[in-house]
Regions:
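Bacterial N-terminal signal peptides that target proteins for export
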Residues: 1-7
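Bacterial Sec-dependent N-terminal signal peptides
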Residues: 4, 16-38
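Bacterial N-terminal signal peptides
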Residues: 8-16
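Mobile, glycine-rich extracellular loop/lid and propeptide segments
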Residues: 30-166
Length: 166
């Protein structure tokens, strides 16, 4: 009994002395919501129905926007936005040769990375890397099951995927 009393006393002492006033959370910095009334729509484009234009990536070197379009077809739409008041789809890159649906795109240093799931969602997926100017395939990389997101490292030397692996 004395053993448990001593252990309890030590535990209580430890808890009391491990807390300090500086551990108390400070109030968060107040944030201001942006006034959205200053934003105006300058253009819009219809890429299809459900599943169209879910994920996009912009390439500043070509002024092109790459949009995942899993609506009626499995493709990436290439949108010229060099003139923002008159945007248009200039190309569609079919994802059919690469497996299942494209889930994500990212752009860095003239390269477009597309995360593509396998037709069997538990099998390894792919990241296909395209040139953003001529859409040629630069590399195909096998990744984990169901790659749901793709991004480049800040220096553009590495590609990272988040795989759902259902």
């Amino acid at each position: 009994m004395k053993k448990y009393t001593l252990l309890s006393l030590l535990a209580i002492t430890l808890v009391l002395f491990s807390c300090s006033k500086k551990d108390i959370a400070q109030p968060l910095e107040e944030t201001q919501n942006e006034d959205l009334s200053g934003y105006l729509e300058i253009a819009s484009i219809n890429l299809g129905g459900l599943g169209a234009a879910e994920i996009t990536a912009f390439d500043p070197s070509t002024n092109r926007l790459f949009a995942v379009n899993n609506g009626a077809e499995n493709k990436i739409d290439v949108i010229d936005i060099s003139n923002p008041s008159s945007i248009s789809v200039i190309k569609s890159i079919s994802m059919l040769p690469y497996g299942g649906y494209v889930n994500s795109v990212a752009v860095s240093n003239g390269k477009l990375a597309a995360a593509i799931e396998s037709t069997n969602k538990q099998a390894p997926g792919k990241v296909v890397v395209f040139n953003t100017s001529n859409y040629e395939v630069l590399k195909t990389i096998t990744v984990g099951a169901l790659p749901d997101m793709v991004t480049f490292s800040p220096d553009g030397n590495y590609i990272l995927t988040a795989n759902e692996g259902e």
